[in-house]
């Protein structure tokens, strides 16, 4: 599996300079300016705020119900009995049974687990070749080998249940249908094949289902720990994939790229690596569940060479260089996220175990309406939610102690904010230009409001912050509706 976060370790000083210039130009182009590095307590120069129109809060996007797809994979073959062994042709060996063909007339075929008291362990090459009327087939989980072209010409196939494994020397699904390369696989797998339930195995190989354009609903086995690079690339009809019940640890680069119909992706908490562009081109994605934001965790194993580069200052840890949502959608830098994130994305849920939301994590993720954070997150990084235009409310878990500079800067539709009981540190310009923000509740542990913290919050009417003893410059600049607080 190709693991591109490590490529970040090869960035030299020239590339770093280019990215710094890109960031500077991007910030200059924005309608307001995030805070520069400033020593806390210094007097900040006056910030001139432009006239900002409060946006229409209406958002009529509604998540699509995927229950039909879930039911389809869960109930597949549930009431269909196995065919009689007398209708199958097969060979019996000392180790098991190899099915070589079928002579019956069933259009929905469930192969039995055992024949003559021995497990069915293999499907021979060409075993069901040319069965153009076959609608569905279930291969028992005891099977460890399926020969090439076993289902070639099964052009009416709509549903299939089969173990995860590959033909010898052909690690791609299309080989079962006569393809001789993964690139050609999509042309051999029947477009009619829409439902696939995979069983057994621990790896979905690289390019395994490359361009299988008819697949709509797929269930991943509860034993799989790795999904390879480009595994479901260009599966343009893939709408639903059941994956959150697995012990998955790694998803390769562009594993689901080009899955233009995919509605949601819910990964398990066990994942420690997510490849570059994993969801690039998933233009209809509405919700996602991830264990962290970025390409990998800080405990992701590095080579000695990579460790030396980090210690020598020639590189940063890939968990830091990839710690933004746009990385998963193909953006090479966090400032490019807006051009890659699907406009359909409404909800992001971060799973328990995540301890921090990195700087720039959701930078200009303008379409997102809701981000669910788990108890255990301790810090919201700098610019973490900068420019999240459709974020309407935020309630932090009690574990959060710090909010970085510009963390919610420019969240123009956010109306309410509530800090958890553990919050004590607010960054400068943390809520600047949140023009729709009406109500803010901060715990008594917050004792200082830093420079420009609420500047430009035109709608702010209620601020509950009884622990505040000091405040910086221009904290409430243009907060004309707020009463009881001094500029």
Predicted regions and their residues:
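N-terminal Lys/Arg-rich, disordered targeting/topogenic segments
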Residues: 1-3
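Sec-dependent N-terminal signal peptides
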Residues: 7-22
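C-terminal motif of bacterial Sec signal peptides marking the signal peptidase cleavage site
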Residues: 26-29
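Solvent-exposed loop and capping/linker segments of extracellular ligand-binding repeat ectodomains
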Residues: 31-37, 41-487
